[in-house]
């Protein structure tokens, strides 16, 4: 009887010792968080831009939108550069997705640059293009996160943190632009 009990305890101890516990969250969760955050930023940014469309202080709003578009443009370039450097560490499938995202971001940045010169005259159009630039960036990040998540086993471990860092920098600047535009619209 004691021998059977000893064997049972030994088997239980052996099975618990063989279990592997992972402390770090899987990369899949990290990319899902980025995707969710991109959707939230786009929603908030769109709501704020729509709410200031009727502001009485048009000069301040136009200046804030112009400055904001400059800032978003710089961040789009930085995000594109980060994607370029991440491509060197990625595998073939991830490289294709990263290259496509980078090209789409560069196209979005170019569209925003083209609409920049006559801010006073084209404030509404610039606001729309700025909103579209943020939306396109959020969509590209979401699409990229899905692509990388579908190839998690093949994706290099270095890729997810680089993507997250680049996107966090972009989202911080978008939030700063939001604040500045909102402050300009709030001034009476």
UniProtKB/Swiss-Prot annotation:
CDD domains for the chain: ApoLp-III_like
**Does this UniProt record's set of keywords contain Transport?**
yes
Provide the residue ranges of the propeptide in this protein.
18-22
Record localization: Secreted
| GO CC term, one of those recorded | extracellular region
Question: Which tissue types show expression of this protein?
Answer: Expressed in fat body and secreted in hemolymph. Also expressed in ovary and testis at lower levels.
Q: How does it assemble?
A: Equilibrium between a soluble monomer and a bound lipoprotein form. Apolipophorin-3 associates with lipophorin during lipid loading until each particle contains 9 or 14 molecules of apolipophorin-3.
Please describe what this protein does. Answer: Assists in the loading of diacylglycerol, generated from triacylglycerol stores in the fat body through the action of adipokinetic hormone, into lipophorin, the hemolymph lipoprotein. It increases the lipid carrying capacity of lipophorin by covering the expanding hydrophobic surface resulting from diacylglycerol uptake. It thus plays a critical role in the transport of lipids during flight in several species of insects.
Q: Which family does it belong to?
A: Belongs to the insect apolipophorin-3 family.
The protein here is known as Apolipophorin-3
Query: What broad taxonomic lineage does this protein's source fall under?
Result: Eukaryota, Metazoa, Ecdysozoa, Arthropoda, Hexapoda
């Amino acid at each position: 009887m004691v021998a059977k009990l000893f064997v049972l305890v030994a088997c239980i101890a052996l099975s618990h010792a063989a279990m592997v516990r992972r402390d770090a969250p899987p990369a899949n969760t990290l990319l899902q968080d980025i995707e969710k955050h991109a959707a939230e930023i786009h929603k908030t940014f769109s709501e704020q831009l729509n709410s200031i469309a009727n502001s009485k202080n048009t000069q301040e709003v136009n200046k804030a939108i112009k400055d904001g578009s400059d800032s978003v443009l710089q961040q789009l370039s930085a995000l594109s550069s980060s994607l370029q450097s991440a491509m060197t560490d990625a595998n073939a499938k991830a490289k294709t997705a990263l290259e496509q995202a980078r090209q789409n971001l560069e196209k979005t940045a170019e569209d925003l640059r083209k609409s920049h010169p006559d801010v006073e005259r084209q404030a509404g159009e610039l606001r729309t293009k700025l909103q579209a630039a943020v939306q396109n960036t959020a969509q590209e990040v979401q699409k990229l996160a899905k692509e990388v998540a579908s190839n998690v086993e093949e994706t290099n471990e270095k890729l997810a943190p680089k993507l997250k860092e680049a996107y966090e920098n972009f989202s911080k600047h978008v939030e700063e632009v939001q604040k500045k535009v909102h402050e300009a619209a709030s001034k009476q």
